[in-house]
Amino acid sequence: MIEITAEIRALIDKAAASVELAEDEYIDPSDGLIHCKKCGGQRQTVVPCFGKPGYFMPRCICQCQREAEEQCKAAEERQRRMERIKRRKAQGLQDRYLYDYTFANDTGQNPLMDKARAYVENWKEAYKSNIGLLLFGDVGTGKSFFAGCIANALLDQDVPVLMTNFPTILNRLTGMFSEDKSEFIASFDEYDLLIIDDLGVERSTEYAMEQMFFVIDSRYRSRRPMIITTNLKLSELKNPPDLAHARIYDRILERCAPILFDGKNFREENAGATRQTAKDIVNSKQD
């Protein structure tokens, strides 16, 4: 800071005579400059004129103003982040029911959910090492819920995730020109994690198999992780019926660590609860 000489102090005092102070400001007699009543910091400084003799006294911000500005910027960034996450969820979770697949809604009945939490906790390493998961097992054992919890948790951390399935992808590809198809498939690389739900439910036509290969191969080449859920047995994936399936399954098995879901059928249990609730409703009598 410039030393306040008698000459400079005279200039300061002259300028102070016409200055307008805010309610939280005062002029400090010790230096004649504007200060903050709250923190005591300077809100005015002395700067030499460039290229000619003399000085001028511009405004500056004090510590509490700086903190308030930083808090405002942080709040704006939080708001932008929330809006960004909301947009990413709308894009990444294309079925509304997936919004409920969260760790907060986990009943604790499936011990495998600890692996889902661990995957999220170690996401940076999983992403760096291109580690995906292959969730296989019978219908209703919690594979989609497991994958959905990972998707929601990472999306909440502002990680781009897409959870979809091949019937949806194939439906989108229908009617597209070749160039548009390539662009659509390449768009999956915008997501740090790609989740393909229910592999094997799609029709195994030549066209479908070709498009599935393009999607999996594109992901494979991008060296970004994917999570696959399927009702197929691991033996079926390791011993595919033909070359078309082999090209797809080999890439999945190379990049995705298998996890077996062999517990109870949660979907059947939920259906039982639904039937009981429906029974209570239709059999109830109003007073």
Region spans (language model):
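Short glycine-rich substrate-engagement loop in P-loop NTPases that contacts/grips substrate
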Residues: 111-120, 128, 151-191, 203-210
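Walker B catalytic acidic pair
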Residues: 198-199
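A short, basic N-terminal segment
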Residues: 1-107, 269-287
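Pre-Walker A (pre-P-loop) alpha-helix and adjacent loop at the N terminus of AAA/AAA+ ATPase modules
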Residues: 93-133
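Hydrophobic/aromatic beta-strand patches that form the interior of the parallel beta-sheet core
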Residues: 133, 162, 195, 227, ...
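Walker A/P-loop nucleotide-binding motif
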Residues: 127-147
